[in-house]
Amino acid sequence: MNNKIKINKSLKFDISERPLIIAEISGNHNGSKKKFLNLIKEAHKAGADLIKIQTYEPSDITIKSSKKKFFIKSGLWNKKNLWNLYKKAHTPFSWHKDAFKLAKKLKTTLFSSPFSERAVDLLEKHKVSLYKLASLEITDLNLVKKIAKTKKPIIISTGAATLKEINDCLKLIKRYHRKIIILHCVSDYPTLNQNADIQRINFLRKKFKSNFIGLSDHTTDIHSAVAATALNVVVIEKHFKISENSKSVDSVFSISPKKMVQLKEFISKVHESLKSKNKKTQKNKHFRRSIYALKTIQKNEKFTKENIVALRPKLGLCASKYFKILNKRSRKIILKDSPIYEANIK
């Protein structure tokens, strides 16, 4: 089974390395191109390995209608009209050129979730390195096929999809390539920590026989993302906002630059502790015990509880040999407080 998926010259998904961090800009620009470009700058500055945007026009997702069926009935966007919500949140196609130009200048990797075939065409013009398929688009097999045919790595979010839908999607992509990363995701906005279901990462890994599993996290903090690191994910995605006080369509479950810095620091430390080996070092000998002479022991004298003791540091025979040498005899004179070695024993 492959252990790496190359993204570009500088990045790869690697099961032996720290999870890559994706900063999802989404609609946190509030319709301002200036803020949009600034979000890319700040995400890069905060340490995001990849920066993701969303490529669609409202007409790629819904119909302009004021009928009741086109209004959201619960959650964060309760009573919002679909068309108006996507109009507010979308990143205009005309902004993409400057976004990719900025990413190139910053030497960061910018990519996107396309929501239509024409969006894929636009992204191909900008030579994206990879794609993300949103969980709500996983059943749009025309879109899946269009993305798969680029033969670029695809990150698949699974939040709103059934196992059969995920499987059908994977089968289609595998006709073209196997550079697939599967994300565990809960499509609640925001997701409560008690509903994060982080253990599902292991289920997805086993179910789809993949090393390349990640997390798209919609909780309001970074705890779930840090916990996922211990389950050997290759990527973690968090929505990103310009500051703690920012107000936008996704701001409730987005993190600030300060939190992004913390996230990278914490997952780096967790990953470090997971891959570290408990190797013996010269330092620990000072905290281990070995056998010493309690008093001067004469040549041919027996070792007894009265003349040997286990003390620190470990310079001679390990303390575990204590009972084995009792009643054996010394080959030579051993001075008081000297360590006892194998060569000292008959």
Language-model-detected regions and their locations in the chain:
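Catalytic cores and adjacent flexible loops of soluble metabolic enzymes
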Residues: 1-346
